């Protein structure tokens, strides 16, 4: 008869902590040396269009969407009016207002954001952290935005609750052609 030794409680605690921190970490975006640094107030004024997908980390199910963003910069505040059209027919509008607080740092508000969003330049990328109220739940977003050599912008986000990743978003944006 064999007996197994139960795992030590500290080992289990350490394992859980490492799993939670791995799930909650922000996504990485590969940036080539030829890609220019991202400056929000330079990229977003005017019209930007994009396609994205939210992927549920537990089920693997996906929800695709298109977005049209109309941006304006008044020298201090970047306003982004986002019109979403989901593949299932739902439409939604959100409006970001980012205020530059120092070179490369911003604070932002949106109608569904709890408190203020925080954005900052890190190398050639911009990182954005915020909490969103979704149907009675508050979930955390950690976005990384980076320009590509072709002028498109890649936005990858991790969505989490209590430090556990529940989903991810990948969105590719391009400036709309001038009419």
Question: Model regions: which residues?
Answer:
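Extracellular beta-rich ligand/substrate-recognition surface
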Residues: 28-30
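Central antiparallel beta-sheet cores of small beta-barrel/beta-sandwich binding domains
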Residues: 51-134, 138-142, 176
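C-terminal motif of bacterial Sec signal peptides marking the signal peptidase cleavage site
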Residues: 19-22
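Bacterial N-terminal signal peptides that target proteins for export
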Residues: 2-12
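Bacterial signal peptide processing site
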Residues: 24-26
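Edge beta-strand at a domain terminus
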Residues: 142-154, 158-179
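N-terminal helix-cap/turn-to-beta initiation motif at the start of protein domains
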Residues: 32-47
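A short, Trp-centered hydrophobic/proline-enriched beta-strand micro-motif
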Residues: 44-52, 155
């Amino acid at each position: 008869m064999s007996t197994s030794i139960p795992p030590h409680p500290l080992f289990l605690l350490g394992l859980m902590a490492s799993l939670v921190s791995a799930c909650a970490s922000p996504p990485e975006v590969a940036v080539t040396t030829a890609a220019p640094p991202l400056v929000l107030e330079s990229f977003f004024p005017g019209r930007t269009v994009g396609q994205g997908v939210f992927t549920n980390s537990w089920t693997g199910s996906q929800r695709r969407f298109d977005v049209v963003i109309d941006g304006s910069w008044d020298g201090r505040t970047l306003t982004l009016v986002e019109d979403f059209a989901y593949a299932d027919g739902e439409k939604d509008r959100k409006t970001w207002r980012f205020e530059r607080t120092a070179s490369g740092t911003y604070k932002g508000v949106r109608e569904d954001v709890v408190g203020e969003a925080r954005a900052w330049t890190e190398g050639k990328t911009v990182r954005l952290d915020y909490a969103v109220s979704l149907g009675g739940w508050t979930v955390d977003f950690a976005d990384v935005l980076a320009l590509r050599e072709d002028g498109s912008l890649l936005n990858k986000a991790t969505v989490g609750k209590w430090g556990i990743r529940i989903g991810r978003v990948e969105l590719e944006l391009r400036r709309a052609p001038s009419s």
